[in-house]
Swiss-Prot record:
Belongs to the cornichon family. The chain crosses the membrane at residues 11-31, 57-77, 123-143. This is Protein cornichon homolog 1. The gene is CNIH1. The keyword Transmembrane applies. Keywords: Endoplasmic reticulum, ER-Golgi transport, Golgi apparatus, Membrane, Transmembrane, Transmembrane helix, Transport. It is found in: Endoplasmic reticulum membrane; Golgi apparatus membrane. Involved in the selective transport and maturation of TGF-alpha family proteins. One of its GO terms (cellular component) is endoplasmic reticulum membrane. The lineage of its organism: Eukaryota, Metazoa, Chordata, Craniata, Vertebrata. It is a multi-pass membrane protein. PROSITE patterns: CORNICHON (PS01340). Its main location: endoplasmic reticulum. Residues 1-10, 78-122 are cytoplasmic. Interacts with AREG immature precursor and with immature TGFA, i.e. with a prosegment and lacking full N-glycosylation, but not with the fully N-glycosylated form. In the Golgi apparatus, may form a complex with GORASP55 and transmembrane TGFA.
Length: 144
């Protein structure tokens, strides 16, 4: 059982994916609160917007790590979400800060539903990725 760079990448990905799972859960709860009018859109967008860039950077860091470790299957599984993150960030509303959510448009029913679906899809992806990274870490540690 040897400790390789690929094993380190999977271990770090496990820890950071747990963080991304909490981000996705926070995202889902925040949009549910908006849907049920528990919180106003300005406050909610002010708490959600600072989480966007760290989430995207953590995921991009995964992709760079797995590229350097030559874990091609793992990189291939992460590329669609990375491409979506890049597209989503490039097509964000024009604002003064680096966020995605505009308080003036977030309460539109279609945008709110889209953001909720996005949160659930990301939660599913991060949960599946967490268990895949766990499997990959064990496989790399045992096989080398």
């Amino acid at each position: 059982m040897a400790f390789t760079f690929a094993a380190f990448c999977y271990m770090l990905a496990l820890l950071l994916t747990a963080t991304l799972i909490f981000f996705a859960i926070w995202h889902i709860i925040a949009f549910d609160e908006l849907k049920t009018d528990y919180k106003n859109p300005i406050d909610q967008c002010n708490t959600l917007n600072p989480l966007v860039l760290p989430e995207y950077l953590i995921h991009a860091f995964f992709c760079v790590m797995f590229l350097c470790a030559a874990e091609w299957l793992t990189l291939g599984l992460n590329m669609p979400l990375l491409a979506y993150h890049i597209w989503r960030y490039m097509s964000r509303p024009v604002m003064s800060g680096p966020g995605l959510y505009d308080p003036t448009t977030i309460m539109n029913a279609d945008i709110l539903a889209y953001c909720q679906k996005e949160g659930w899809c990301k939660l599913a992806f991060y949960l599946l990725a967490f268990f895949y990274y766990l499997y990959g870490m064990i496989y790399v540690l045992v096989s080398s």
